[in-house]
Amino acid sequence: MAGSTELTIPVTRRATARARVPLPTLLLAALAAPLGAQAPPSPQDVLGHALGERFTDHGQVVRYFDALAAASDLVSVERYGQTGEGRPLLQALIASADSRARLDQILALNAELTDPGTSAARAAEIAATNPAVVYLSYGVHGNESSSSEASMWTAWDLARGAEGLEGALEGAVVVIDPALNPDGRDRYVGWYRQARGANPNPRPEAREHWEPWPGGRFNHYLFDLNRDWSWATQPETRARLATWARWNPQVHVDFHEMSFNSTYFFFPAADPINPAYPEHTHEWGRRFGDGNAAAFDARGWPYYTAESFDLFYPGYGDTWPSLVGAIGMTYEQAGSARAGLAVERTDGVLLTLRDRAQHHRVAGHATIMTAVNGRGELLEGFARFHRDTGADAGDVLLVPGADPSRAAELVGMLQEQGVQVEVAGRAFEANAGAHNGFSARRSFPAGTYRVRARQPRGRLATTLLEPETELNATYSYDVSAWSLPYAFGVEAHTVRGAPAADWTAAPGSTRLMGSVAAGGWTGSGASLARPAFAGESRSFVASSESGPDAPAASASSVGYLVAPGMGAWRGVARLLAAGGRAIALDEGFDAAGRSWPAGTFWIPAYANDDLDGRLASAGLTGAATPVATGSTVNGNDLGTEESYDLSLPRIGLLAGEGVSPTSLGAHWFFLERTLGVPFDQVPADGLGAGALAPYDVLIVPSVTGSGRRTLDGAGDALGAWVRAGGTLVAVSGGASALAELAEVERVQDEEDDDEEEDEGDDDDLEDALLGREARELERWEQSVPGTIFELSLDPAHPLAFGAGVSSAGDGDADKLFVLHSGDLAFMPDEEFESAAYFPAELAELSGVISEENLESLEQRAWLVSRRMGAGKVILFADDPLFRHFWFGAFQPYANAVLLGPAY
């Protein structure tokens, strides 16, 4: 509170940081309550304004929860992580004195309910006395801003025993996460405070209702955190999932906002609904909906259910919790970024921030009380969910293959979500069905991973690993496919029974994705100090023939060989940044007792002083194989001219208005936190010859209409820069916008020509007479909503180095699995190279696509490289970094950025 004296309060066990509360607030509270019975402070007491009068930034939210914990024995606050910008992530536990006294026992019994081996009788015994765990998550989209306001209101209500919550804490312990995305929230709140006048303007045309790019929806790295639950790429998600097994909630609510002209949405969900959910999940979705409806009806508030917001894609804040046993639900309040503090709807109703927070508050109350009133049934159903896990599903075997780092990365992603993984201590045989092949008796090597279907996170594991998830509707809110073995390029099989193979728990796997610690690179240029990496003592292992036991280089060694892969690229980038030298060999060969693929890195001794020290600093020691001679058994010798002398390119990444925020964020995060290379974000509105001159590589993420116009306007400058030696790498919408510059014809250009020739066809009349549902289905199918395909790869092309995998273990590493969305593909031409393309007789592996779109993709290019003067343009039909989880597509992208200037 401005002008007030503040008192620093020592924090007790109920809060993990120091809380600053205005002195007048404390004095008034102390006078109003007898010693030892201090009334919990309201948000207004601590913040100095009533909820809804102004936006509360995250620092103020933290201050309120700390003050509440300091004043109430029922509330404790824990910092469970921090955001990309260093803001704390909070979990507030609100529980009765009795529940607090036996909290460890409550949570242990709750965890026992997740064990598939817990009997129905034992579950009933636990359910008779244990409270339910209700987890309320607010503000995963930072500009859906009423959520965090409602979190404070709800916490205060629980702490003071507000009317309507009688008995709530006897039947439940409540966990409140007041802001899942503090960085996005403060981006929005900070802008709004600057944009509004002395009083809020409710006219929707006013500036304060038009949030600028990139918006507060996203986190620091511009990721949509409500798509990240199942991939755990972002620090906020990873920190939250690390706490999940402590709580194992029976109920999880994800509070959102939608169009300010809408009403309020709560469950039951719309179709499609993931088939992994048992009737327990559906039944309780309806029961919570009934409870919310009664609360809203009593107040005359409008709402709707089951019309939108499905429960299919596993990365949502309702779907993922539901896959691990909670009744996960999305609640959507009218409002969002355009609502501000007050907005006039098209029906003339004035919608205020306080209204929006109040609706979330009441929905939260109703949800808690529905859980409390049905506590016993809820807990027994929770136990049954886990007891029946794996009843109809087989276990999944993951084969490490030629590049074990792929399987290790996949295992790390699963383990981070609490999935148990085992590893075979010896080779074995089993009857197994290949995910993209047929069933047969097969041999599997030692080191094969097994993911059991019957385990606490079994339904989640099955959903993430199965080759295709059944879609029970004609439309999905998001992508229609995601199978992780395809995403990582890992051979996968389904097996029933338990083949003997000396199975043990797989060791924890350090993920490559996002593991570069923040605070390293500060700009472009190879002279900068390298960034700090998490787990520096651990070298990655790139192939089964190399590892930490590989012999040290002898005095006569000519250097080291490193097989291509993502871990190799990161290590080589470190080496180059530190002044070392590496060479990429253009063809495969045999040396040092094994075969090496095209794209293998040679780290020559003659060009690297203190070679072993350089390898250790780059994290390459465990992956490097020493070679004592430059001669090879088969193929070119190491000194061949068929090679590429590498240097770390100066990289620019297009950013700003017109660039897709999430696409930009994926590239930013990949370059900074996964690959660990320096780069500059280049303002889109300043493209020109001068702006491009400092760079060897310019990356163009997906763009919107205004971004396309920006690129069109900069066409001459971009063309001149490429012809002078620049490498232009563009993906998805950015590639579509730059195809004309590269003189690459898009498939849709050909189709547009065909449509002009067919204008007036009878089919147009039939299309015009389609019913509404048929139109919606056709529109969705035409969009290609995230469908998995197997592409043919040119393994000799530099863009394909290290990227190819075999199909169903056939041994030929000439395939690439991609998640294709939209209608972009390129017409092959002799004037440029097609490094990856859709084959003839194309069929989707997983997901939805119309027959017409399927045929239009056959024998069309997905990844092309076009030489222009001394430079080149590289175009990807999709964004290979989409949501930063399609690991198999990272390699061709890294090749484009780091090898592109050299080949």
PLM region descriptions:
Residues 38-145, 149-173, 221, 227, ...:
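Intrinsic-disorder/low-complexity accessory segments
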Residues 186-202:
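Aromatic- and acidic-residue-enriched segments that line the glycan-binding/catalytic groove
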Residues 169-188, 785:
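Short, conserved secondary-structure transition motifs
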Residues 1-20:
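N-terminal secretory signal peptides that target proteins for export/translocation
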Residues 254-255, 700:
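Conserved beta-strand positions
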Residues 177-182, 192, 255-262, 734-735:
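Short, solvent-exposed turn/loop segments enriched in Gly/Ser/Thr/Pro and often Arg
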Residues 203-223, 764:
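Aromatic- and acidic-residue-enriched carbohydrate-binding clefts of CAZyme catalytic domains
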Residues 22-34:
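Bacterial N-terminal signal peptides
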